[in-house]
Each structure stands twice: as structure tokens, then as C-alpha cells.
Amino acid sequence: EIEYNSRDRYNSKLRGGETAVINMAENLANLNHQTCVINNCLKDERINNVNWINIKKIRKEKTRIDCDVAIANADANTLNLVLTKKKFVLSLSIQRFEKFIRKGQLLPFMIHKPKIIVLGKYHYTNRSRIISIFGKETLAYTTDKMFMNETLLDFVPNTQVIFSSRPDRNLDLLLNVWNEKISNKCPNVKLLINPPYTLKEKDKNIVVRRLSDQKDLLNDLKESRAMLIPGHKAELFCLAAEEAKQMCVPIVTYGIGCLYERVADKVTGFIAKNDDEFAKYSLDLINDDGIWKEMRNNLLKDRGKRTWNIVAQDLLEIINK
């Protein structure tokens, strides 16, 4: 487990799940709720009105926290650490029944009978009914406020596009279409991708980003003409795409997994049916200032509308049903 608390908010070691915990906890606290996060933080500490509690200490002392509501982050076993009648599990995967058993979720699930919280339409449809028998609710995430508040460039030149998701999220699909159908038609444009990845001889104009803190990502998105991201069956929300949206970067995708939920086709980006369409739409955004400006303006209209404060309020509605 990652050792973190809210002081690590912009650290490169954190992924979307961890930053979501930080933002959700702090915004629940801002709504005047006593909020505790039990995780692998190094020590017990109160930060921004949130109590961070070391999970190893709780397990060692065999104590249980008394609370009104408990929300387990993907692992129903952590519900053993609390005393409450209202229990939820925030699902971060499709989790087929076989994996559910293998991960040791069946026994605590049957003991605690939690409602499952999923992240969107794709997740809701594909989450097994068998392991959602005590109820299933949908809660859409959002991004950190820094992506909403950053001052944008008035115009982004056509010199850079970006893929800022994990390499195992179908980066190979993107590189195939980039090398075969895109890069030779825009030789002055570089594609930024995330590590780990070893460049090959066939790769053209590809730059592997250095992962430091999220402020570097902020700058890379600010200077990117478009985000090229195929999507993946394991993508349930895709924070990378949402970060691009909040930075008003148009997206080209195949719509795999939840990606069709992040893009309004031909309004804030393009959903391609095949490689030829993916290449065409990418080149349209790179080369046609009119298309790029139209989509950029559409993104600006919705920028900053869904904050973590709103997400926290939506969560409270789910809890109070």
C-alpha cells in the first residue's frame, strides 16, 4: 500500500484513487462532517480538518472506530475496522466474480452487506450483479482544482500532443496509429507519453515524460494541442482524460471503456471508429485552427462546473437515501 496523506497531494507516487480520497475527505470536512481516513499513512495526523489514522496501528491494537458511515476504498475487509450501520464500498474495478473471490472479498462482503459505489455508466453496466446485491450507486469523480484554476494559454501551437495515462492503458494501440498514420503527416509535432516505456527505432517524434509532481503535468497539458488516448476496458473514469478536459485540451479516443463518457463526440473531441478515423481526427485538431478553437471554446464553457465540493454533496445524497 502507498504511504500517503494530503501533504502528498501532488506527489508523482499517487494515482487517481489516492488523490480522489484526499479531495473527497477534505470536501466532506468542509461541509462540516467529522472525517477520518484510515490508510497506510506514516502517523496519525490532523490535516485540513481531516483525521489521518494509521491502519497498521488500528490493526495492531485491534480497535474499531465508531462512526456514522464507513466507505471502504475498494477493499471490504477494511469495514472490519469500524462500527457503523451504514457501509459502502467504493469500487475501483470491474472485478469479475473469480477475482472477487481471489481477493478475499466474499466473506467481508457477506458479513457487512455494503452498497457498491461505481464511477459511471460503463462501470455500472459491467459491474457484476452478483457482487452488487446489496445495492449499487453511481458517483462521478472530478479532478483536482488546480486543473480548473490554472491560467491557460490564449492559443496553443500545433507542436505537441499528449497521452498522459498509464502505458498499460492501450498505449500500444496509440503508437501503432501514430507511427503508421499520423507522425509522417506532421513531422514537427511531438507526442508526449508517460513512462515506463523504452523508445524503439520505429517510434517517431515520441518523447517519454519525466514523472515528477503534477505541476509538470499541468504545464505539459497547457502546451498540448490535443490528447490522444484510445481508452481501455479497465478505465472506469479516466482521470487523465478529465484532467485534459479541465485544461480545455480536446480529446481523440476510440471510446473504449469509459472514454465515451469523457468526450462529447464532435463537440469536445472525437470518438473514432477505426484507425483511419483516429488519424484523421488527430490531424484535424493538429492542423486546423478553426476546429481546434471551436472545441476549445466548448470545453471552456463547462470548465470548473463539477468540483469536489459537488462530488462530496452527491456522495452525501447517496449516503442519506
Give the ranges of each region predicted by the language model:
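A short, active-site helix/loop in glycosyltransferases that binds the activated sugar's phosphate group
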Residues: 98-102, 112-136, 148
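Short beta-strand->alpha-helix junction loop in the catalytic core
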Residues: 122-123, 138-151, 197-199
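Conserved catalytic-core segment of nucleotide-activated headgroup transferases in glycan assembly
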Residues: 154-207
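Short alpha-helical segment that forms part of, or immediately flanks, the ligand-binding pocket
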Residues: 172, 218, 241-246, 260-261
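Acidic donor-binding loop of glycosyltransferase active sites
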Residues: 222-236, 249
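A charged, aromatic-enriched C-terminal amphipathic alpha-helix characteristic of glycosyltransferases
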Residues: 273, 290-319
